[in-house]
Every structure is written in C-alpha cells, then in structure tokens.
C-alpha cells in the first residue's frame, strides 16, 4: 500500500513537472484547426458586438483550463483563402508585461517542407475555429491572439488570464529553432525576432535578403571555380 502511494506521488510529481515545463518557457504555437466545427448561430452571434471593418475578425474564448477556442470570421464579401501550415493558422499568443506593453509569449515555427503550406477556404461571413494552448502561472495579465495573413496582422479580443512571467523571455528553443537561425544566416537578431513573432512584411524582407545571399554565394563559388580552372 505504501509502495503504491509512493508510486502515485512520483507520478503526480512527474506530471506536475511536465505541466510546469510547458508553462514556464516560450514555445511555438501549436493551434489546430477544428475540421469538425459546424458554424452555429451562437458562434456567429459572438461577433455581433464587433464593429471592426477589418477583413478578418477574431474572437478568443476560454474553452477549459488548458485550451482556448479561437473563432475566425471572414468579414469581407468575397471568399477568403486563409494561409495555413499543416492545418495551423499563422497564430501566436501575446500578453501584457509588467509595464502594460504587449509582448509575444509564443513564437512561430516555419516548416521546411513545401507540402506543409496551403490555404483554408472561408466563404463570406463564415466562421472557422481553431484551438490553442492556455497557460497558467502566478502573473495575472491580459492575453490576446495575433494572426498574420498576407503581410497584415489581426488581433483577437483580450482575456484576463494567469501565466508565468518567464514566458516573456526569448527561450533557447526560439534561438535554436531553424526559422530563427535561417534568418540570422543572412540578417540579424532583430529581423529573426520579427519573423518568428509574425511581424508584417518580416518574412518578405527575409526572403529578399536570402535571395541576395544565395546570389552572393553563387557568385563566390563561380569565381572560386574559375580560379581553380585557371590553376
């Protein structure tokens, strides 16, 4: 009986450690589009108080202790082909720091596989749903979701939540991620952060710098080969 209790305590401790580990370091957003979501009148009426004329409207709600539900509405009168990566929206979570400034508490990890990229068709006035991780901690603040679409940023409503303040620190996971490192190869830390934190036009700037870098490397190789052939 005592042994069983000890094992249970160790298991509880392990689970607690895992949960704490998920809440105390900045990680990449893993939102997942709910393919089984059926738009209801309730889901649509959620947007009734939104007077914004932006082409995309976003409402975030607390689903449970560990999940947010995020509803995304096509607010224009034409079809919206929303960019997706492996059924994930280009979405990260932000929170207000101790000074009241909005800061990212998640980052975006770009896929290296070309097949990962696609789009989600949303008819005019229609709503889709995605779900994203909800954090916990001792720091009471406001959170919101940031969506990047076609080099334009859209924000959800804000919600009062508790997080760990350590989430504001850019973790080693972020710095060691391929998306971050690829930008550093051709540019600097500032642009690397803009890219993984889904700033508008950041990826476009990276793409332009990357093309120039590839052209420079190609030219250097050509000169080297030309020199070797002469020798």
Segments the model singles out, each with a brief description of its role:
Residues 23-68, 75-81:
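Low-complexity, acidic Ser/Thr/Pro/Gly-rich terminal tails and inter-domain linkers that flank the onset
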Residues 67, 90-92, 142:
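Exposed beta-strand and adjacent loop surfaces of beta-rich binding modules
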Residues 1-25:
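Bacterial Sec-dependent N-terminal signal peptides
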Residues 24-29, 34, 130-228:
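Terminal connector regions
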Residues 63, 121-123, 136-140:
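Surface-exposed coil/turn segments at beta-strand junctions on protein surfaces, enriched
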Residues 120-132:
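Short Pro-Gly-centered flexible turn/kink motifs
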Residues 77-116, 121:
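The feature marks short-to-medium sequence segments in extracytoplasmic or secretory-pathway proteins
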């Amino acid at each position: 009986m005592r042994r069983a209790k000890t094992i249970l305590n160790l298991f509880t401790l392990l689970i607690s450690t895992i949960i704490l580990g998920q809440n105390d370091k900045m990680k990449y957003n893993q939102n997942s589009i709910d393919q089984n979501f059926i738009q209801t009148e309730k889901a649509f009426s959620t947007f009734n108080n939104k007077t914004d004329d932006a082409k995309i409207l976003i409402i975030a709600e607390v689903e449970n202790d560990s999940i947010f539900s995020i509803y995304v509405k096509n607010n224009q009168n034409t079809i919206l082909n929303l960019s997706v990566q492996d059924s994930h929206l280009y979405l990260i979570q932000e929170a207000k720091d101790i000074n009241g400034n909005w800061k990212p508490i998640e980052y975006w990890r770009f896929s290296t596989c070309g097949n990962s990229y696609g789009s989600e068709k949303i008819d005019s006035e229609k709503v889709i749903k995605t779900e994203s991780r909800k954090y916990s901690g001792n720091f009471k603040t406001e959170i919101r979701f940031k969506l990047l679409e076609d080099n334009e940023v859209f924000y959800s409503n804000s919600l009062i939540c508790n997080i760990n303040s350590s989430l504001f620190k850019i973790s080693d996971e972020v710095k060691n991620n391929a998306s971050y490192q690829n930008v550093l190869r051709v540019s600097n830390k500032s642009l690397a952060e803009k890219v993984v934190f889904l700033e508008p036009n950041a990826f476009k700037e990276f793409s332009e710098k990357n093309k120039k870098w590839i052209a420079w490397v190609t030219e250097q190789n050509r000169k080297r080969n030309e020199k070797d052939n002469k020798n």
